[in-house]
């Protein structure tokens, strides 16, 4: 580590400017930490992020790294904290997300409403089928990577249940067809061969692959979300029901850090959070730059980012730990509990370490 000089006082050195490296990964979700990294705020804070390689990729689900921070979907951290390794992480912040998502059909499909899905072939991951059918089998005995992939089928499962409700249908009214689903079906060899766990490396050409599945005629509809949904729609596919218009389909993007850092290096954690908050505020006036850096991280077009995350997502990047944000996380936790994907609830208020975010926000009041 090296100390840097405070530009306002050349004769001094700042503890907050000590250079540190943290292992890092992010899911394909909007987040202030990625923004802080790509826009220079972390560099100014003396922090570098070392993105997980594909060969290190299991850490993205196990959190088994002493100096690790992750910004992504809420299901993996809930499983780690509630099922496998309680106390390994602390919750630093939440970014609510409600973007484009739904079950898509070909443009020439006769399906125009949810009720038209009756008797149709719905393509979902094998993980989602296990959840929807209540057939978890050996779920609790699986290794962390495969276990988490099963639980990630929750995204499709919840979306299908909500879609079918619009047509007053149930799961038994459609035919579930197993297909490979991006973000859920990630074989170990695919992970290990990926340069990093960035979306651009791990999930290339998602929309093209999904469009090909629809074109094959093997299924009548399949699920897509996030910027991938925007790119799939650009191929001519259309959602049967735009679930992005329904608040029940909002998710909590969760930011965690190794608990050991909170205990042993609170100053480092504070610098990290300060940089993310500053970047989140900066993003409000730099929407084009923020959109571009997210697009590059995921390997998608800037237009797809706006569709997948919401046109004004740049205004909402500052992490939160307020009641509504925690309630959003609790809603996902309840789905996991109801479907036996989680055995005991995580006490979210105890998991959270709000002092860092509170300190950062107070700097701007």
From Swiss-Prot:
Upregulating conditions: Expressed during growth on DBT or DMSO as sole sulfur source; this protein accumulates to lower levels than DszA or DszC (at protein level). Part of the probable dszA-dszB-dszC operon. Desulfurization is repressed by sulfate, cysteine and methionine.
CDD domains: PBP2_DszB
Regulation: Inhibited by the end product HBP.
Keywords: Cytoplasm, Hydrolase, Monooxygenase, Oxidoreductase, Plasmid
GO MF assignments: 2'-hydroxybiphenyl-2-sulfinate desulfinase activity; monooxygenase activity
Alphabetical GO biological process terms: dibenzothiophene catabolic process
Record-listed 2'-hydroxybiphenyl-2-sulfinate binding positions: 27, 60, 70
Quaternary structure and interacting proteins, as annotated: Monomer.
Protein name as it appears in the record: 2'-hydroxybiphenyl-2-sulfinate desulfinase
Gene name tied to this protein: dszB
